[in-house]
Regions:
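N-terminal capping segment at the start of a domain
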Residues: 5-33, 134, 323, 380-384
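A non-catalytic alpha/beta surface segment that caps or lines the substrate-entry region
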Residues: 27-74, 78-80, 84, 95
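Short helix-loop-beta-strand segments that form the rim/entrance of peptidase-like active sites
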Residues: 157-179, 259-260
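Midchain, well-structured core segments that form catalytic/ion-binding scaffolds
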Residues: 116, 124, 130-143, 175-299, ...
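Metal-dependent amide/peptide-bond hydrolase catalytic core
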Residues: 239-410
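Short, conserved micro-motifs enriched in small and acidic residues
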Residues: 33, 139-150, 232-240, 388-395
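Active-site metal-coordination/substrate-binding segment of hydrolases
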Residues: 73-168
Length: 410
């Protein structure tokens, strides 16, 4: 076990040294050069581990295959993690700090003023005695999703080194998951699986197979500028129109006031001037019928606004779907959930089924017909300078991946 932990830790520390922060404004993938550098590094490691069909596409998608070594394990399972880190926080020059046998209380991050406190993060009380990996307070850590990469790679290493019986295994590492481009160039024809798992969750025990239905709405207001001293009956202020329009949304139907399986509208961007304004809304709901109602609500609100204002330039609205709830696909492959549950229980873990209040690469794969639930990594506080992961949680993820691959003993 200690040998596995040392390997796991070293892999993780190696991977977070790559600056793979994705760029929100990018129209191509990979959106950052560091992702391709990490992809090529992983390609070499996979070859050294003895995997077959190891490929890296021009879009930095890494795929590899490990054939079954047991005649009774003929099915194929995929494991997926993403290369990039969030654009919300710097991922350059990450300096991890390893805290062995955490004794509780505040954790100072580096030499600055940043710290992590159980007052703000009560889950820290559950981590006393664990080995924590934290940041120096200037960057994110990159456990999302390099912990997942390290866990998959370590599991492959253990399977090979100890000759543990396993099914056919497909592995993929994808770019730009954080900006929604992760599956855009995914070579699905080169990744034939009965089902797959993303290793991209949070605390130990998380098993996620429901996510938001998601769409974005772009609403455009056109105004007419003129000198404000002579503006009576002439000026049309697009900024004022946009503010008034936004007041038509339900006040409590927002991210900061919803949880669980509750959906929301989220004003994500407001940009422009007197002559033109664009509002960007995120539309989210788990229930397909309610999701359709939310999109209809916005169209109706625009129609009503245009009717009441009699504008020369009517408000324009374009709504585009982003991804769907993966449960519509996963429910048809119940063994994907049953196997993950059994593997966790065999590792002494109580499965925690919870909805994803977001999306994953698995949601996009589900649209293509591949069931792909999400499994924990052992990390917390993703996308922030307070991000951390426990070495013990990562080791549990390795054990679960191995158990899933070696499902004949479950």
């Amino acid at each position: 076990m200690e040998e596995h932990n040392n390997e796991l830790l070293q892999r993780f520390l190696t991977y977070v040294a790559f600056d793979t922060q994705s760029k929100s404004s990018a129209k191509h993938s990979p959106s950052s050069a560091g992702q391709m550098k990490l992809a090529l590094h992983l390609q070499q490691e996979l070859i050294e581990l003895g995997l077959q069909d190891v490929n890296v596409t021009k879009h930095a998608v890494v795929t590899a295959y490990l054939p079954s070594n047991h005649p009774d394990l003929t099915h194929t399972i995929g494991f997926i993690s993403h290369l990039d880190t969030s654009p919300q926080c710097s991922g350059k020059n990450v300096q991890p700090e390893v805290i062995e046998n955490y004794r509780g209380g505040d954790i100072a991050l580096g030499l600055g003023e940043e710290f992590i406190s159980p007052v703000y993060y009560p889950f820290l009380h559950q981590l006393i005695g664990k080995t924590l990996i934290v940041t120096d307070g200037t960057t994110l850590l990159g456990a999302d999703n390099k912990a997942g990469i390290a866990e998959i790679m370590t599991a492959l290493s253990v399977l090979q080194r100890e000759n543990i019986p396993h099914c056919n295994i497909r592995v993929a590492f994808t770019p730009d998951e954080e900006i929604g481009l992760g599956m855009y160039y995914f070579p699905l024809d080169d990744f034939p699986c009965d089902w797959a798992y993303t290793i991209d969750g949070g605390e130990v025990g998380e098993l996620e197979y429901e996510n938001f239905n998601a769409a974005t709405a772009k609403i455009t207001f056109k105004g007419r500028g003129i000198h404000p001293g002579y503006a009576k009956n002439k000026l049309v202020n697009a900024l004022t129109l946009a503010c008034e329009f936004q007041q038509g949304f339900p006040k409590d139907d927002v991210p900061e006031k919803t949880s669980g399986k509750e959906g929301f509208f989220h004003l994500d961007d407001f940009k422009g001037d007197i002559e033109k304004v664009e509002l960007h809304f995120l539309i989210r709901d788990f229930d397909q019928a309610k999701f359709k109602q939310r999109k209809a609500f916005i169209y109706q609100l625009v129609e009503k606004f245009n009717r009441e204002k009699s504008l020369k330039d009517p408000v324009e609205c374009v709504i585009e779907d982003s991804y769907k709830n993966m449960y519509d696909t996963v429910k048809n492959v119940p063994q994907a959930i049953e196997l993950a549950d059994a593997a966790m229980k065999a590792c002494g873990i109580t499965p925690n089924h919870k909805p994803i209040r977001g999306g994953t690469d698995g949601a996009f794969l589900a649209e293509k017909g591949l069931a792909c639930p999400n499994i924990f990594t052992g990390g917390y506080n993703f996308h922030s300078k307070h991000e951390l992961v426990t070495l013990e949680g990562m080791e549990k993820a390795v054990e679960v991946v191995i158990k899933i691959a070696n499902c004949k003993d479950l």
